């Protein structure tokens, strides 16, 4: 593979004399077509490559044409394209399982597709470079355009984890053969087609069974089911009161008894303790402990912290991170890795120093590089990092949301290479009136990485807990009781899901049921989990309630009703997580795509032939009546896309 020269050398490098035939000799500039995923990224590529001449839908110069997609330009055709009878929804026509898949150009992006198609067929273009996002969906976006355009020219793959100019230049010098990503493309195709088959067949099946539009999704429905199960557990929870006796010791500190279910038992102990007036030290145990630095961020971990500390939704965090990536301030955001590769070790100390300086961290930062290096745990992209470009950027000019997300990512880098947080934990066991009382104290020995965390995120972390210092006493010694009181408490129900905890539940779904040695994928991927939550909210299955930082995600009545009528196999997180694991195996070339698709088709066929409407479910699925139709007097009901008269003839 020839080396990509600097832009100033491009004309000489890419101009070659071509003999069209024996009678006609001409000079043609041979160009390479670069296809990015979006215009802003294409602009960054064009700047590095020297393609500075703006055209309609692309840039040109120095041997390159740089154009872009606008999301998915090509999409799966709807059922009626396969057969006109599918316009009408009928259980008799199910399952719909295409043998030969058909695709259409999205109506809203036909112009840009046309531009790409013309560029791919230009006689001076000898090859194409796939420069869409380096991941499963980016691969799919390009390949569908390439195939739909009927392009047969060779193409190579640009694979980047950073949008810095040096990284872009190096990436174009080290283009990958397209065949290295065939398995990734196969996994993307399987994911897209499986989602289509589940969505089309299940949505039609249950809509027909219950007489109203019901949206069902391979990933969406299990996530909704998790929230419904959680709310059912909260509703079924029975609060139980309990009672404890709390002693205030004259030498300092407090001590608590065990819990009593009966108030009378606790009151009896309280009376005895007041009468006895002193405790005997039975055991004093001191242990030194440490808390290791946190791992670097992957996307899901970043989204969880941004929700917990900043109140951002998962989608907001992804949008901010994507913008920072395109501004060359962070590395590729849609990563599922929390480590770096061995070849990054040498440059990491400089990045840590630059990052600390950018955020005015004046204290010396210990740098333990090996804590974050583990190439065996890096998949397509390494963990999220700030870039060196950030050191010279005007951070104050960034929108507040982007600035806060950048601060989180930078703080995590500084913490991850830091020293352990060390503390001493003391447990004091005393006896009063024949009953054991316990006290716990904690004293910080060395702040370690938490000092940097407080410096970077102090206002976001909230008020720190004061250390609890227990009196220095000897075993079998006695201490006077300065006060005793009865305290009443109650057991706590499960907590409502927040975006933070729901992301965690999606990430860890089916962990207990996975066989030993099998890599767990959870529900969805880091790149799709935010979109899944947003889709559930937009379709009216989930709603956000509460203040910004404490918003919870609650299933609506519509969401609860949908899960009530769903068969277990459709709402099962375990099955969906198993599919994600199999998609990963396809991506790695460990599983045949045809085998996976056959499994999906069998499941759908079985579902269609065995599922019947549940008795009484129509009552649950009934739409909300909001008024009377002025035309015919029938009920006007609220549905997903607006208000409709129940009378189909109206």
Where are these predicted regions, by residue range?
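OB-fold/S1-family RNA-binding modules
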Residues: 29, 79, 124-129, 250-272, ...
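C-terminal or mid-to-C-terminal helical accessory/interaction module adjacent to the motor/catalytic core
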Residues: 101, 123, 165-249, 286-290
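Basic, low-complexity terminal or inter-domain segments flanking catalytic cores
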Residues: 26-33, 109, 120, 148, ...
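Intrinsically disordered, low-complexity regulatory segments
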Residues: 10, 14, 18-192, 196, ...
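Structured, non-catalytic alpha/beta "coupling" segments that mediate domain-domain communication
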Residues: 55-86, 221-265, 414-468, 640-648
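Metal- or metallocofactor-binding catalytic centers and their adjacent structured scaffolds
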Residues: 179, 263-297, 303
């Amino acid at each position: 593979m020839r080396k990509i020269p600097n832009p100033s050398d491009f004309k000489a490098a890419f101009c070659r004399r071509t003999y069209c035939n024996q009678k006609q000799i001409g000079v043609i500039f041979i160009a390479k077509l670069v296809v990015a995923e979006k215009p802003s990224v294409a602009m960054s590529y064009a700047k590095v490559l020297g393609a500075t001449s703006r055209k309609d839908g692309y840039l040109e110069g120095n041997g390159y044409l740089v154009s872009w997609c606008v999301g998915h330009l090509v999409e799966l055709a709807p059922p009626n394209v396969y057969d006109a009878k599918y316009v009408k929804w009928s259980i008799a026509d199910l399952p719909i399982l295409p043998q030969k898949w058909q695709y259409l150009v999205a109506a809203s992006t036909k112009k840009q597709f046309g531009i790409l198609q013309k560029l791919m067929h230009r006689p001076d273009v000898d090859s194409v470079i796939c420069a869409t996002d380096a991941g499963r969906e980016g691969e799919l976006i390009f390949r569908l355009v390439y195939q739909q355009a009927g392009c047969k020219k060779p193409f190579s793959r640009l694979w980047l984890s950073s949008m810095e100019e040096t990284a872009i230049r190096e990436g174009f010098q080290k283009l990958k053969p397209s065949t290295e990503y065939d398995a990734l493309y196969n996994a993307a195709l399987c994911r897209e087609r499986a989602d289509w088959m589940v969505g089309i067949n299940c949505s039609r099946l249950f809509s027909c069974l219950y007489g109203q539009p019901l949206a069902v999704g391979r990933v969406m429905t299990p996530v909704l089911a998790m929230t419904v199960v959680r709310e059912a557990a909260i509703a079924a929870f029975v609060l139980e009161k309990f009672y404890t006796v709390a002693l205030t010791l004259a030498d300092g500190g407090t001590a608590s008894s065990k819990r009593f279910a009966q108030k009378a038992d606790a009151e009896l102990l309280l009376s005895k303790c007041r009468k006895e007036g002193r405790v005997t030290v039975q055991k004093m145990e001191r242990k030194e402990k440490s808390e290791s630095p946190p791992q670097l961020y992957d996307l899901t971990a970043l989204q969880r912290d941004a929700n917990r500390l900043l109140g951002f939704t998962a989608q907001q965090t992804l949008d901010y991170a994507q913008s920072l990536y395109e501004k060359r301030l962070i590395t590729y955001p849609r990563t599922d890795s929390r480590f770096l590769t061995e070849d990054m070790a040498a440059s990491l100390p400089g990045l840590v120093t630059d990052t600390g300086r950018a955020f005015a961290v004046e204290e010396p930062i210990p740098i333990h590089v090996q804590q974050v290096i583990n190439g065996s745990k890096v998949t397509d992209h390494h963990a999220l990092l700030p870039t060196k470009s950030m050191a010279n950027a005007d951070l104050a000019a960034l929108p507040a949301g982007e600035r806060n997300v950048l601060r989180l990512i930078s703080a995590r880098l500084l913490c991850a290479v830091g020293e352990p947080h060390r503390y001493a934990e003391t447990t004091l066991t005393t006896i009063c009136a024949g009953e054991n009382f316990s006290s716990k104290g904690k004293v910080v020995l060395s702040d370690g990485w938490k000092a940097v965390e407080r410096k970077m995120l102090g206002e976001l972390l909230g008020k720190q807990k004061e250390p609890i210092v227990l009196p220095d006493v000897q075993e079998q010694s006695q201490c006077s009781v300065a006060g005793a009181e009865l305290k009443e408490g109650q057991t706590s129900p499960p907590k409502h899901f927040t975006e933070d905890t729901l992301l965690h539940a999606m990430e860890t779904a089916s962990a207990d049921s996975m066989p030993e040695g099998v890599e767990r994928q959870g529900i969805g991927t880091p790149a799709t989990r935010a979109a899944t939550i947003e889709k559930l909210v937009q379709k009216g299955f989930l709603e956000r309630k509460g203040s910004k930082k404490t918003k919870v995600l609650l299933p609506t009545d519509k969401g609860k009703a949908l899960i009530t009528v769903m068969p277990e196999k459709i709402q099962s997180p375990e099955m969906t997580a198993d599919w994600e694991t199999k998609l990963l195996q396809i991506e790695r070339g460990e599983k045949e795509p045809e085998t996976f698709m056959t499994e999906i088709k069998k499941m759908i066929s079985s579902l269609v032939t065995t599922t019947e409407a549940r008795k009484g479910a129509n009552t649950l699925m009934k739409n909300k009546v909001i008024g009377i139709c002025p035309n015919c007097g029938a009920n006007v009901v609220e549905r997903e896309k607006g208000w409709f008269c129940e009378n189909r003839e109206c």
